[in-house]
Amino acid sequence: MIDLYHHGSSVCAAKVRFALGEKGVAWEGHYLDIHKGDQFEPEYLKLNPKAVVPTLVHNGRVIPESTVINEYLDEVFPEVPLKPNDPQARAAMRVWTKAVDEVLHPACAEVTFSACLRHRVKRLPPKEYEKFLASTPSQSVTPQWRERRRDLVTLGFDTPGLGEQYRLYDSYLDKMEKSLAHQLWLAGDTFSLADIAMTPYVNRLDMLGWGQMWEQTRPQVTAWFERIKARPTFKPALLDWCPPDLTAELLTFGRQSWPSVERLLSQAS
């Protein structure tokens, strides 16, 4: 029995839903509205003290961290392998998944909050607004995430250091373009956990209406993303769980934010 605690817009939860879909493994979902603070409820904090999603429970065993979850799923359900056979390709796969966890995910959090989610948080009633910001554990997405998220919500695109995060995000599209120039998928010629790991982060840019970051200048990334979107598991895992109002707001606020994004991307680091 697999239970997955998740949210529709969480890139990390999407990674796990994508892997479960590719594996063809049935699961029971427990939906947490992370924008209303469901992840701070005491019962969930017992499962995940970081107050983040996803958390997977398999036969009573609690497994946090999306990359760890996906590696676990690939070992427990080996019928549809998501790791390359070649050791060098497996190493390349893990370079991608490690980079996602350590570098790209924190950047994605800052990008998403500055461009869109801060507007949702600012609409909360004053008591809920303060409770939401105060309930965030400091050791969450990054060290001092509680303080950083407050800055992102209140300062938006004027948050100090935000441009570095946008340019870092953009640099990973360059890394993808280079890697895909000589192979079909990120870790070689077979679809793997590397592609699953990167998909939600490219899709996040797409949902913000920023496809121009690759469509005209990065043909390999463009072709890769088209192959990804053609997979039957993509839409159920990446799109269908996102609440329609949030999907609409990501696109609306993303498009409104694009001039600010262009400005940050054009600045020297």
PLM regions with names:
Residues 1-143, 253-255, 261-269:
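GST-like domain detector, emphasizing the conserved glutathione-binding G-site
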Residues 29, 53, 189, 214, ...:
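A generic structural-conservation signal
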Residues 34-35, 191, 243-244:
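Positions that flank functional sites
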Residues 45, 91-94, 197, 222, ...:
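Generic structural signal for individual residues within well-ordered alpha-helical segments
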Residues 106-226, 230:
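GST-like fold's C-terminal all-alpha helical module
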Residues 215-269:
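Long, positively charged, glycine-interspersed low-complexity recognition regions
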